[in-house]
């Protein structure tokens, strides 16, 4: 007969009490080590926390409240892991073969979708399947998740599957709107789930999560899902790079998503959404903040989990619900900042001042600065920023907010702000905090502000010696230590090197003394230092911009390119230096003799270049095969007179001589004259 669990419970209770006593004695030491971030001793925390306290991690829910969907058996786990590997390799011969494989995986996963989504090893497979699924497959999977979303969005692994499902289904909602309601025949799947509308499925998700928004707002995993739903309902372009950090955290791996380097033109357009989404969006936003008082709402601004959700709420409110929404007393914006005048000592002014220096809250303040109505921004700038912009720019955190403020200033305000920031340039350079300086240069070029005072301040800060100046900007002493034929990577570079390189690139884009500061330094450094810059993955971008930007004169390009003589093959075989060699091609467009000399140097090293991956790219970009076989055509291409494409060169007509032009005029005159009638004799 089994024993009762009561006796074991008493032992566990006694042990728990002993552990608590030991914990109480060692609590001060733990607090000192962790600085009180993870100390949940109620006796110690009671005196510090207030009504606006939001714990970072709630106590885990009881196992009885969290449903368990079961585990995959070893054979199933092995099969799905193998399928995940095949999808990762993506070595299918045709798209039809891939679609058949995905259909087979779905058949094998029938009835096990929830197990796979909650599996640590197989949830990645679910994400990959979703990214390659058809509309009918998306609807079928969506329908099987309905009723379980409240639990799935809070799960560590299943929450990522939910996000992928929502992001994949969002574009099809727009397509469904454009289709005729009579078109219901789906050749891919005749299941009843194929006739479901994704619009209704999304509304079912909102209905399922309704009533739990207050808790999900600060839930570690569900908060990401809330952001995705808000953006989908608002019709935002989900492939916009600016939304990448809002949708997912920096730690999330982008599975099967192409990297977007620049913003697409279509990204600025809103997706068409059904009218029910607009109503659902307003209701969801109201439900998210209705039960929260102003104190709790402001506490979310500095909460690591709640802050990104608050950013999305604020951006959607100010961009999709109209600027007039900001005047509504019940709006998120007005509840955060109820005072319009922002007088000194007011509650709103104190709240905003605190956000300037908070590493989490400053991100919300950046969103407010970017999207706030013009009237509020002018009041905010004059009341809280104008007199303090110099001291704010010195701070590492507040400097990012200052950069956003500079982006909205007019020419006159930008000039006055620059005058207040100039005394702090020396301090900013010593601390390698170039964000404000970089933004000043960018906005000064756009607004047409005279940047010579800033150039003089940078000259004093970096040094009048051109060699020492480029060393201070790019931190070249680190390059000298690493210049030992060792593999370098941009991941190994320090933040100071990266920010210095970005500042130098920005200075090169400004015509006048700012670009001359960098150009003169590049001409003054030794050849070894110049080659080290060209081979560095971070600093080489400065050299590429110096060679290709319109601010570089032909005299500078002639002087800088001639220094690479004898080093072209060495640079062409380097992963970073090869990009500099490509930039030399563009820089020598009007310097054909220098370009020919470099081509001869590359031709002499043909075998090493062809054996190297980056070398083959340089060989192709310099059209060296054309240089070997058709030297005259290569010269025309080098001058920009002809295209490299042989088909274009064959269709190209050579210029007509004066004799050919005279013959053409005579032939045209003969055709326009009245033809003679010739009588035919029979």
UniProtKB/Swiss-Prot annotation:
It comes from the Eukaryota. Residues 1-46, 249-272 are annotated as: Disordered. GO terms for cellular component: 90S preribosome; nucleolus; preribosome, small subunit precursor. Pfam families: PUF_NOP9. It is found in: Nucleus, Nucleolus. Belongs to the NOP9 family. The keyword 4Fe-4S does not apply. Disulfide bonds: none annotated. This is Nucleolar protein 9. Residues 16-35, 250-272 have a biased composition (Basic and acidic residues). RNA-binding nucleolar protein required for pre-rRNA processing. Involved in production of 18S rRNA and assembly of small ribosomal subunit. GO terms for biological process: endonucleolytic cleavage in 5'-ETS of tricistronic rRNA transcript (SSU-rRNA, 5.8S rRNA, LSU-rRNA); endonucleolytic cleavage in ITS1 to separate SSU-rRNA from 5.8S rRNA and LSU-rRNA from tricistronic rRNA transcript (SSU-rRNA, 5.8S rRNA, LSU-rRNA); endonucleolytic cleavage to generate mature 5'-end of SSU-rRNA from (SSU-rRNA, 5.8S rRNA, LSU-rRNA); ribosomal small subunit export from nucleus. PANTHER family: NUCLEOLAR PROTEIN 9 (PTHR13102:SF0). Keywords: Nucleus, Repeat, Ribosome biogenesis, rRNA processing. The keyword Transcription does not apply. Residues 1-15 have a biased composition (Basic residues). It comes from Blastomyces gilchristii (strain SLH14081). One of its GO terms (molecular function) is RNA binding. Pumilio repeats lie at residues 108-143, 347-382, 383-419, 524-562, 563-600.
């Amino acid at each position: 007969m089994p024993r009762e669990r009561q006796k074991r419970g008493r032992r566990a209770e006694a042990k728990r009490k002993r552990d608590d006593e030991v914990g109480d004695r060692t609590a001060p030491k733990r607090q000192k080590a962790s600085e009180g971030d993870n100390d949940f001793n109620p006796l110690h925390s009671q005196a510090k926390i207030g009504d606006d306290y939001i714990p970072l991690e709630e106590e885990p829910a009881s196992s009885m409240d969290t449903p368990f969907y079961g585990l995959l058996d070893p054979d199933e786990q092995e099969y799905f892991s193998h399928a995940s590997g095949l999808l990762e390799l993506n070595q299918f011969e045709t798209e039809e073969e891939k679609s058949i494989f995905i259909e087979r995986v779905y058949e094998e996963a029938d009835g096990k979708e929830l197990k796979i989504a909650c599996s640590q090893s197989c949830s990645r497979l679910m994400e990959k399947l979703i990214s390659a699924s058809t509309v009918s497959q998306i609807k079928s999977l969506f329908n099987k998740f309905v009723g379980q979303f409240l639990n799935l969005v809070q799960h560590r692994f299943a929450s990522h599957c939910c996000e992928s499902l929502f992001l994949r289904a969002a574009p099809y909602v727009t397509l469904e709107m454009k289709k005729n309601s009579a078109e219901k025949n789906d050749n891919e799947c005749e299941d009843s789930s194929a006739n479901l509308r994704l619009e209704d499925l999304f509304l079912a998700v909102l209905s399922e999560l309704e009533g739990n928004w207050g808790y999900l707002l600060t839930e570690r995993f569900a908060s990401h899902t809330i952001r995705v739903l808000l953006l989908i309902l608002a019709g935002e372009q989900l492939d916009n790079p600016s939304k990448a950090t809002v949708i997912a955290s920096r730690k999330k791996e982008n599975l099967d998503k192409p990297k977007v380097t620049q913003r697409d033109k279509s990204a600025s357009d809103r997706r068409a959404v059904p009218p029910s989404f607009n109503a659902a969006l307003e209701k969801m936003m109201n439900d998210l903040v209705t039960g929260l008082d102003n104190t709790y709402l402001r506490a979310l601004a500095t909460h690591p989990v709640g802050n990104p959700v608050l950013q999305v709420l604020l951006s959607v409110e100010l961009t999709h619900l109209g600027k007039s929404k900001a005047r509504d007393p019940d709006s998120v914006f007005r509840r955060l900042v109820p005072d319009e005048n922002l007088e000194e000592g007011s509650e709103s002014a104190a709240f905003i001042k605190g956000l300037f220096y908070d590493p989490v809250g400053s991100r919300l303040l950046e969103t407010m600065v970017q999207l706030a109505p013009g009237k509020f921004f002018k009041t905010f700038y004059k009341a809280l920023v104008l007199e303090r912009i110099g001291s704010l720019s010195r701070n590492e955190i507040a400097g990012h907010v200052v950069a956003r403020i500079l982006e909205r200033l007019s020419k006159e305000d930008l000039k006055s702000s620059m005058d207040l920031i100039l005394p702090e340039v020396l301090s900013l350079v010593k601390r390698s905090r170039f964000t404000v300086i970089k933004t000043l240069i960018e906005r000064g070029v756009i607004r047409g502000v005279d940047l010579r005072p800033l150039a003089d301040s940078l000259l004093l800060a970096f040094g009048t010696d051109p060699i020492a100046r480029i060393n201070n900007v790019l931190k070249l002493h680190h390059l000298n230590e690493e210049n030992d034929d060792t593999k370098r990577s941009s991941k190994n570079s320090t933040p100071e090197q990266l920010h210095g390189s970005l500042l130098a690139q920005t200075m090169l884009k400004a015509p006048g003394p700012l670009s001359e500061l960098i150009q003169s330094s590049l001409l003054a450094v030794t050849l070894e230092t110049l080659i080290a810059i060209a081979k560095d993955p971070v600093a080489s971008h400065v050299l590429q911009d110096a060679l290709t930007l319109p601010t570089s004169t032909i005299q500078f390009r002639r002087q800088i390119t001639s220094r690479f003589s004898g080093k072209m093959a060495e640079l062409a075989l380097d992963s970073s230096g090869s990009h500099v060699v490509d930039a030399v091609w563009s820089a020598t467009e009007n310097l054909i003799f220098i370009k020919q000399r470099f081509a001869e140097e590359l031709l002499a090293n043909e075998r090493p270049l062809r054996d190297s991956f980056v070398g083959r790219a340089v060989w192709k970009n310099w059209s060296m095969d054309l240089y070997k076989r058709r030297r005259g055509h290569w010269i025309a291409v080098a001058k920009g007179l002809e295209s490299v494409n042989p088909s274009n060169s064959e269709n190209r007509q050579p210029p007509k001589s004066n004799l050919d032009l005279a013959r053409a005029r005579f032939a045209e005159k003969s055709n326009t004259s009245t033809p003679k009638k010739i009588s035919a004799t029979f």
